[in-house]
Amino acid sequence: MNERPITMNDIRNRADEAGFASLRRRAFLLGSLSAVSAAAFPAAASANSLRLEMILRDPAAPVSGNPAGKLTMVTFLDYNCPWCKKTAVPMRDAVLKDGDIRVVYKDWPIITKDSVEGARLALAANYQGGYEIVHHALMAIKARRAEADEMRAAVRATGIDFARLESDLKSRETEINALIERNHEQAMSLQLTGTPAFIIGKFLVPGAIRSAEEFTSLFEKAREQV
């Protein structure tokens, strides 16, 4: 049976489904690490390496940390995810301290419809090199479920060229929506049930990482598997 492509309407509808957020696995300890392998992907094994390469190397995905870093970490996130917010600063601190981590951001807005607006704002900011500053501004919003207006105010407060951002939201709408759709498809291929989730080297970590020290420990474990 041929399945139609995932659309932005599908993502918005899923974000609005009652009870979906309750499926998120909130906190996983180091012992719950599982190696990313063919078994993690529902498609044929021959396609798995290509799919993982697209997750790691999607040219449109924002990248921070050390773009030439030898260890790649992918983070799936939602700007209305409370555990994503708690994870953001420890992750940033650990990445800065390490100096050799390439971070790939996967905006996966699944918790509320306003989460989609947050993702679109951050991705539009990437066209002027402002993804990371907008990312941290959105993560710093204290409201448990931030609305679109509150998100826009937080982005404006960063001092980013908001007129250009709005222009990019319109002119790059197709590219931005396509990236969010790809992120969603990739999350489904990994059988993720919610945010946050991480790929660190060869490990899939489906849940919150609570401290910079935990991130550092995971970096070390991932390097042992290279």
Regions of interest found by a model, annotated:
Residues 1-23, 34-38:
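N-terminal secretory signal peptides
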Residues 21-30, 36-52:
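N-terminal twin-arginine translocation
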Residues 48-64:
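Short N-terminal segments immediately surrounding and downstream of signal-peptide cleavage
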Residues 67-80:
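Short active-site neighborhood of thiol/selenol oxidoreductases, capturing the structured segment around
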Residues 72, 99-102, 129-132:
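Loop/turn elements at helix/coil->beta-strand transitions in domains of secreted/extracellular proteins
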Residues 81-85, 198-199:
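The canonical Cys-X-X-Cys-His
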Residues 85-97:
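Typically the conserved alpha-helix immediately C-terminal to a functionally engaged Cys/Sec
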Residues 109-195, 199-225:
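Cysteine-centric redox/oxidoreductase cores and disulfide-bonded domains
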